[in-house]
Amino acid sequence: MADPAAPTPAAPAPAQAPAPAPEAVPAPAAAPVPAPAPASDSASGPSSDSGPEAGSQRLLFSHDLVSGRYRGSVHFGLVRLIHGEDSDSEGEEEGRGSSGCSEAGGAGHEEGRASPLRRGYVRVQWYPEGVKQHVKETKLKLEDRSVVPRDVVRHMRSTDSQCGTVIDVNIDCAVKLIGTNCIIYPVNSKDLQHIWPFMYGDYIAYDCWLGKVYDLKNQIILKLSNGARCSMNTEDGAKLYDVCPHVSDSGLFFDDSYGFYPGQVLIGPAKIFSSVQWLSGVKPVLSTKSKFRVVVEEVQVVELKVTWITKSFCPGGTDSVSPPPSVITQENLGRVKRLGCFDHAQRQLGERCLYVFPAKVEPAKIAWECPEKNCAQGEGSMAKKVKRLLKKQVVRIMSCSPDTQCSRDHSMEDPDKKGESKTKSEAESASPEETPDGSASPVEMQDEGAEEPHEAGEQLPPFLLKEGRDDRLHSAEQDADDEAADDTDDTSSVTSSASSTTSSQSGSGTSRKKSIPLSIKNLKRKHKRKKNKITRDFKPGDRVAVEVVTTMTSADVMWQDGSVECNIRSNDLFPVHHLDNNEFCPGDFVVDKRVQSCPDPAVYGVVQSGDHIGRTCMVKWFKLRPSGDDVELIGEEEDVSVYDIADHPDFRFRTTDIVIRIGNTEDGAPHKEDEPSVGQVARVDVSSKVEVVWADNSKTIILPQHLYNIESEIEESDYDSVEGSTSGASSDEWEDDSDSWETDNGLVEDEHPKIEEPPIPPLEQPVAPEDKGVVISEEAATAAVQGAVAMAAPMAGLMEKAGKDGPPKSFRELKEAIKILESLKNMTVEQLLTGSPTSPTVEPEKPTREKKFLDDIKKLQENLKKTLDNVAIVEEEKMEAVPDVERKEDKPEGQSPVKAEWPSETPVLCQQCGGKPGVTFTSAKGEVFSVLEFAPSNHSFKKIEFQPPEAKKFFSTVRKEMALLATSLPEGIMVKTFEDRMDLFSALIKGPTRTPYEDGLYLFDIQLPNIYPAVPPHFCYLSQCSGRLNPNLYDNGKVCVSLLGTWIGKGTERWTSKSSLLQVLISIQGLILVNEPYYNEAGFDSDRGLQEGYENSRCYNEMALIRVVQSMTQLVRRPPEVFEQEIRQHFSTGGWRLVNRIESWLETHALLEKAQALPNGVPKASSSPEPPAVAELSDSGQQEPEDGGPAPGEASQGSDSEGGAQGLASASRDHTDQTSETAPDASVPPSVKPKKRRKSYRSFLPEKSGYPDIGFPLFPLSKGFIKSIRGVLTQFRAALLEAGMPECTEDK
């Protein structure tokens, strides 16, 4: 929204206005906000020349601090969700998240949850109320970009598209003294401390052990008016009331962790003090009618409950591998050290902290009125005042140095000018009415501009800004204060992340939300009527509780080319959401993938610099010396293609990673017994060493061989012991906007996937939220029963094996579940429900019996699955549940698919499809379905026992499938089945033309489950290369298709008993093997039509082509016996066609590159973004505005969006044509239209570039791709010649 206090549009101040600090979680940043016309009511963002290339980037991202109009006034807010994301970003936040706005309350929150987020809108959480609202991006103004160390970013104003890693951030905060109307600015985030020494979710070091806090007990030290001191637990403290309530808690303690702070004034009845522990002074008389007024002196943690993760190398410690007790009592808390060296990067809007007055500040006398304004409108006007006060300095800085970045030191102001600043601020805000344009007077602006800025690097202390307040306004707000204080619903209450396992999105803590007794309300009114100003002298060293009201972030970034740029304003950066696996940064540890490279596994590389456009890296190769105390350089620095190197499997270190010491230090010095051994990575050096900040804040530089990164273990063990803690999370906390999630047995389970739900004992799981409406078919209900029974059957046999070692309680539950499921097995849905058949429509508020029935079945399934996971003694051969293709013992030899020229031995259509061995059926398209006598021994599912419970029904289904395959196979698909195992199939799919997969063959093993078609078939992709050549085809064999239940799908995309094997094959051919496979990755489709998406898609195609050639080389050398004849026939012509086509592209690129270098300095075509003007104008006819229609991948958030048998037709659709949306706001100037998307990837190429249209984005070819593809083509040529497939002249 337009800031009424903003200066004239000519002043570029808004771009520099401070904003909230970044989140603890590395969050993507936002692109710049366009600047609408001054008269409009929309956000005034940076001017057009400061924006990104028009139509090339997003506007806002999660965790950005924005300002906009809410309930009639300007408010600050945090972006919590952007279009294309799955769930609220606060679901990822850890313990020390936002306090002031961590819980949404009221209608805004509910509406945000219920309605999907439309394109062009973001979900904003307004400060300080915490209400969430969907707001159009163009109506918001970006105040501060959230970046934290290790974030990958790009520079928004540069034409260079290389990315960089944030190595440090500096955050200047404006903080408000809690309970007052005084603002201190600037305060560096490093000068702010946490109110509580430990919080939920903290990682801690305890001697040699690393652990994570999952619960804690707190107490507060209170001081009475007579000087007596006592300690009270926070449960009793929650019964007291705040004399100066905060607007976001409306007089209610919203959480133990954030509800108390030093200096807080509380009041409550004497009976609450009956169980406190008196520490000093005279204990008062506790009469029933008396009330005590106390001041919080200190907040303390008295007990920690910890999940222990791992033990580090401990030379002076014990050899015991037993972890410490899970409960750490107060006497041992001194041995606990928090891993918090990056706390300063995590300050954000609404967070409460402690601020210690520095010694360099003269003693300050601050006057304020208490209680602070306690209504939304009052707080909203505060946002205007803060922005106005801070903007003055920004304008002065920029007028002095318009061409340079705002230095972090420039924003300081001399304390001598404090009075002048305060006077001006009071004059500006004295009247409740504001001028329409909100601009300051010309005299003020001129005076501010005339002030001399301080020299760069001059450190000055913060100064105090007092919000001006008019007495009339204050009087008028009293009633509103009382109404807000009386409010006891969730509208303005806030629940901190500390009481919730999903950190700050639950409605937990309701037991602490006490209504205010009438006597207390009256007392508050009396207190307000006094209107006396309270004064307090602050001396250096005094600690005060403050709340962050806005921040200004600057970052130090190391770019891919090795250069380091400091003090970049975070608003000038935007995050790289989807980082290519082949992007490497200086300091990354890598290994060589080239066949001819040194086979010594001890040799590893360290990236010195990278060429983003050329896709190459300069790498130094190192090897550990035999002494083990240092490394030696092997050879010279080498320019290597990014496609020829991979991340080191063991040395993966990034800034902020938690590491433990696992070996001796390199200098061989004697070990100290208390030498720290748990810490965080501060920096990865190009010299092949890692700088670590240990838990005691000491720093050392250490070899990677002596460190172990435990990030992967943390992800697995985060909540291993959380069952013991009290979550308090409400059921709606686990809701999400997605559609479904896959289960191990292929059944699509809940309508709402859960958000990282911690393991809970089987019978204590939270009840899933009830859907407002549900439509359930008989097939779906039957499938649920049959799926659960199928899962239970193999587990029944495990009971005997588990014996005494298995947990008895779990097995008792398992037996009960199996009994129930067996009893349900042969009943129809109608019998189970004892009512009428399911109706297509259901009352929104009343869940049907069908829904409850399915929920019960799903719960049983989940319990069984969890129990199965706990039993690790089952032999693989005995498993009859869903096969896990990842653990197959002998991987089949290289196999692959087939094409249209496959021979058909006997063109006979199958009448019965009982199928005799050796008989081949040719479909109308000329493709082949045949029946072989024996299944090969290396078939992925050969070892899975096949015993269908209803054999007659199963074989009838198989015959129908075979008849369909024999008559309807489309061009490019071949299927074989086996007489001895009618449940097994093998399939070959030929890569479609005009895609990176053209002339390639892709092989799949298939099994029909015992209860097919109630559940989908099992597919295993037989990968021929290391790494994925498609987002949906994993090298471990997993195939991600919604029809298989391995990915999210809707409607006809989900498997039903009427679906067929043919549908799945068509979906793979038409929706997986596509021309831009990059967008198949979940969530990436939202990048379609944007510059970043085009770049990533082009680079992905380079990688896919290289892996296709590598895979085909393996197929030629080791063809699987099932399709050996077909593979040889295909590659005798198709192999050389693939070679010649790629070589022609290399020649074309070389010719065009020479031609483009000739004209008058015309730069050669590259993949870097075009300048803003070119991007805006060159393809104006091909751009479409976008603000409301569904995205191409919106129907399915997963990797595919197939529609059953229509898959082939939908495969040929033009994805990019679906990005049309409504026109943007008329008030926005045309030069900064937001987020236009281009129809075709061809529009990103320079005009008249001459690049051929090959069907998918590949040109211009990168230097790294050319290096790698030439190497793999040489190997492919050799393989073809070795296999006796000489090149024919006509092939060329």
Swiss-Prot record:
UniProt-listed Enzyme Commission number(s): 2.3.2.24
Composition-biased stretches (Basic and acidic residues): 406-427, 882-893
Positions in coiled-coil regions: 812-882
Pro residues: bias regions: 1-37
Inhibition and activation profile: inhibited by phenylarsine oxide (PAO).
GO biological process: positive regulation of BMP signaling pathway; protein K63-linked ubiquitination; protein monoubiquitination; retrograde transport, endosome to Golgi
Modified residues (Phosphothreonine): T488, T491, T838
Position of sequence motif Nuclear localization signal: 512-536
Compositionally biased tracts (Acidic residues): 478-490, 732-742
UniProt xrefs under InterPro entries: UBQ-conjugat_E2_core, UBQ-conjugating_enzyme/RWD
Post-translational modification: Phosphorylated. Phosphorylation affects subcellular location.
Pathway: Protein modification; protein ubiquitination
Localization in the cell: Cytoplasm; Nucleus
GO cellular component: cytoplasm; cytosol; nuclear body; nucleoplasm; nucleus
Quaternary context: Interacts with CPNE1 (via VWFA domain) and CPNE4 (via VWFA domain). Interacts with UBR2.
Assigned protein family: Belongs to the ubiquitin-conjugating enzyme family.
Protein name: (E3-independent) E2 ubiquitin-conjugating enzyme
Naturally occurring in which organism (per UniProt): Homo sapiens
